[in-house]
Amino acid sequence: MTISSAILLGIVQGVAEFLPISSSGHLAILQNLFDLSAGEDHMFFDVLLHLGTLISICVCYWGDIVAMVREVFIVLRGGRRADGTLVQGNLGAARLFMMIVVGTLPLFLVLPINDKVEELYYITPFIGVALLLTGCMLFVSDKMTPGTRTERNMRFRDALVVGLCQCVATIPGLSRSGTTITAGIATGLDRRFAMKYSFLLSLPAVLGANLLSFIKAIGEETVDASLIPAYLLGMLAAMLSGIAAISLMKLIAKKSKFGWFAYYCWGAGILTIILSLIF
């Protein structure tokens, strides 16, 4: 693992995690077709890359995260300050927190088959087909009429539908952000809120996946200390490119142009299938 390859993988992770083009699919393609990976320490490096994108979300949605954490502490204190006086809560933040919890619950369905899902990362033609499906989904999403629901009137069933779609998007090549944003729009969410909910919903998913990967990495891998600088630079690249990608997505959401990415996914999917047959 060289510094340049670590930075490249970090940029790919940060950009593809938030643009609806599938970060898992792109990283798998780079590894399978071009042998560009972290080598024996790949699991530890993956943890750092996802940590970088997690920081990106925290930076871009810091206000929402602080508001939700504040609401949790208000509830734990029975709605009162330390001196016993009542606190005026933030209904939107409280409901958003509940919807993230509900949307995260379906991920437990994936745990028993997680090893089977990971095997798909090594089937390059399958990833190409999944990218084609992602393109179709994004194309359709732009044809949908978005609703008006936000955190204040989002329903529990909306959160469950988006959460179930997030489970499906664990398949490499299917974009998590694209799948969950499209699902949110389909259930009647406002387009910009659907994007915000999608990104915030990834926080517990990334934290949980990172925790499992970290425990597994500690038990199975010995990290090469000489590669730590490259890994940290890769994480920094993932964080910075992630912030840029989220900012771009906010602009695109205003113009309702997620379908632009459909053409990229179709091209990437076709190219992936062709290259997998050649190599």
PLM region spans:
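Multi-pass membrane proteins that catalyze or facilitate reactions on polyprenyl-/lipid-phosphate substrates
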Residues: 1-279
